[in-house]
Amino acid sequence: MATNEMWYETLHTGFGQYFSVDKIIYREKTDHQDLVIFENAALGRVMALDGVVQTTERDEFIYHEMMTHVPLLAHGAPKRVLIIGGGDGAMLREVCRHKNIEQITMVEIDAGVVTFCRQYLPNHNAGAYDDARFKLVIDDGVNFVNQTSDKFDVIISDCTDPIGPGESLFTSEFYQGCRRCLNQDGIFVAQNGVCFLQQDEAVNSHRKLSHYFGDVSFYQAAIPTYYGGIMTFAWASDNPALRQLDMATLTARFSEAGLNCRYYNPAIHTGSFALPQYLLNALAD
């Protein structure tokens, strides 16, 4: 459906961003969220949930490469990976590029998101849903990590912001469950918002994660759609060395994996753990 309307994001009060809507691709209120997918001339197809942009075709690769390749290459030998959320399929797509991984489980609370995105954002999953290693579980993420008997080497929480259905994925109950089902030397990562505008989210996540993990920090990337500066990703493990790998080790692992990335490289990996002083100060308070 062609349209000349403007779509305004409602994440922050007093300022924000807008998108021209060239064509509505899909719009529906699911059991959990109000979902819309539309065409924008600059960014391609855009998906928004509850008034907040989740992903665009133009810049999604930055987010998904950093959420996957940083923990997977830092670990070095992951066999079992858990994705919480990620219904658009792009996180799965990037994880599937690691051929040594044996099992990939994705837990998505909203089956509708998976269905919509497979049809209307096919470039995001790029066929990854058909990978033989993949298993989809429709469940609440908190419930899954606290009930499953499976163990994982890396857990990637591709959560929305801590409002609505995504709120539970920022709780101590969720973090404790993730710690419970991680193997030794396992790594947990999660999106944690744009820290200049959502600093409290980072501080709260750091405080809660520190109850369950010995080494908690953040790494970062600048993603145009998530305006306001750098986006921070929570990092939690019990092995500090995994966050401090030397360039030679990362370069060797990157080469062995045979990855051809558009944003990620070993130098970006190393530099992403350098955080601005205002965030370091907030975390130290």
From Swiss-Prot:
Pathway: Amine and polyamine biosynthesis; spermidine biosynthesis; spermidine from putrescine: step 1/1
Pfam families referenced in this protein's UniProt entry, alphabetically: Spermine_synt_N (PF17284), Spermine_synth (PF01564)
Gene3D superfamilies tied to this protein: Spermidine synthase, tetramerisation domain (2.30.140.10), Vaccinia Virus protein VP39 (3.40.50.150)
Binding site for spermidine: H64, D88, D158, C159, T160, D161
EC number assigned by the record: 2.5.1.16
Residue positions binding S-methyl-5'-thioadenosine: Q33, E108, D140, G141, P165
Active-site residues from the entry: D158
Catalytic activity: S-adenosyl 3-(methylsulfanyl)propylamine + putrescine = S-methyl-5'-thioadenosine + spermidine + H(+)
Protein localization: Cytoplasm
A single cellular component GO annotation: cytosol
Family: Belongs to the spermidine/spermine synthase family.
HAMAP family: Spermidine_synth
Protein name: Polyamine aminopropyltransferase
Organism: Erwinia tasmaniensis (strain DSM 17950 / CFBP 7177 / CIP 109463 / NCPPB 4357 / Et1/99)
Lineage: Bacteria, Pseudomonadati, Pseudomonadota, Gammaproteobacteria, Enterobacterales
Gene designation: speE
